[in-house]
Amino acid sequence: MAIKYELILTDRAKQELEDIYEYISKSLMAEKAAENLINKIERNILRLETMPESCSIIEEFKERKKQYRKLIINNYVAIYRIDEENRKVYIIRIVYGGRNYLNEI
């Protein structure tokens, strides 16, 4: 049986999910598409409960004390770190992949 990790979304990541939904449903007037995308993001994040090391390490952050990884979902990127000792995965950010998000972490 696979070891399960606890998933923790930061307040910022939660807000970013809400912002993604609002933008797509209101600005683009595509509520169903917004719902589908949020569901897909959530399903992919849930996958990290059992396979947190399945995504690539963010090379630009290798010099930092904490190791960050990225989960790519469509045009979005979930940035997270793994706390092996406490079996937790912290979802730090959920951002549009087309922007320079590396400077914002």
Q: Could you say what each language-model-derived stretch is?
A:
Residues 1-40:
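Arg/Lys-rich, positively charged N-terminal/basic patches that mediate binding to nucleic acids
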Residues 21-24, 44, 68-70:
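Generic alpha-helical hydrophobic packing signal
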Residues 28, 73-77, 81-105:
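Enriched for short, Lys/Arg-rich terminal
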Residues 40-49:
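Compact soluble domain cores
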Residues 53-85:
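Basic/aromatic recognition patch in beta-strand/loop cores that engages polyanionic ligands
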